[in-house]
Swiss-Prot record:
One of its GO terms (biological process) is oxidative phosphorylation. Belongs to the cytochrome c oxidase subunit 6c family. CDD domains: CcO_VIc. Keywords: Membrane, Mitochondrion, Mitochondrion inner membrane, Transmembrane, Transmembrane helix. It is a single-pass membrane protein. The keyword Transmembrane helix applies. This is Cytochrome c oxidase subunit 6C. PANTHER family: CYTOCHROME C OXIDASE SUBUNIT 6C (PTHR48416:SF1). The chain crosses the membrane at residues 14-54. Residues 1-13 are mitochondrial matrix. Residues 55-75 are mitochondrial intermembrane. It is found in: Mitochondrion inner membrane. It comes from Saimiri sciureus.
Amino acid sequence: MASEVLAKPQMRGLLARRLRIHMVGAFLISLGVAALYKFGVAEPRKKAYADFYKNYSPEKDFEEMKKAGVFRSIK
């Protein structure tokens, strides 16, 4: 058996290198989730509110609630 000299393992900077890689990954994932939320939830919600209030009439809504008897003090 020939005895071979094993290379010394790297012992310095392992945690720093691993954290650097994982921080970059976490940052990219968080950007992706933020973009998905913005374009998948926030923008459609904003559009739905804009469409609703484009044709909304508070007077008409008030009259419908008045006819339904929601307000006791108004006759």
